[in-house]
Amino acid sequence: MNKEVFEAFINGSLAVPGKFIKFEQIEWSKHPIFDGVELKHIITGKDTEGQFSYHLVRIAPGKAIKNHIHETQLETHEVIAGTGVCINDGVEIKYEVGVISIMPAKVPHEVMAGNDGLYLFAKFIPALC
């Protein structure tokens, strides 16, 4: 798998007025429900007064974020490395580098990583955390 884009972001930084954070300083957090899924909470609701949150997501090969909904958040995915499949409101979407997917609030969705894992940015409006 070509992880160049992922590596660029994992070694990247967040720069906003008054704040500069290297992504390497942000710890990976295990997903509280889904095994093999880890997140870096790049921007949280605390940073945006609850308006949005931004997360780097790493899904291990063959693992999944199983079917779920977000009652109040619109969610976007931007695939930056690896491959997989997203089922978005019953429609299968092939996930590969460059794909962007949008899940409106209350829409069931799930994401399964391929054999090489899956790396994406997930944004939530309003903030998930």
Q: Where do the PLM segments sit?
A:
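A short, N-terminal "cap"/entry segment at the start of jelly-roll beta-barrel domains
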Residues: 1-51
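Glycine- and acidic-residue-biased ligand/ion/polar-headgroup-sensing regions
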Residues: 72-75, 79-84
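A short hydrophobic beta-strand segment most commonly corresponding to one strand
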Residues: 56, 76, 102, 116-129
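Short beta-strand His + acidic residue motifs that chelate non-heme Fe in jelly-roll/DSBH
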Residues: 66-67, 86-87, 103, 109-115
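Short acidic-glycine-tyrosine-enriched beta hairpin
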Residues: 90-105
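A generic "binding-loop/recognition-motif" signal
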Residues: 61, 72-73, 91, 107-108, ...
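Short, charged/polar surface micro-motifs in flexible loops or helix N-caps
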Residues: 47-50, 59-63, 83, 126-129
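Conserved short histidine dyad/triad with adjacent acidic residue
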Residues: 40-43, 53-70
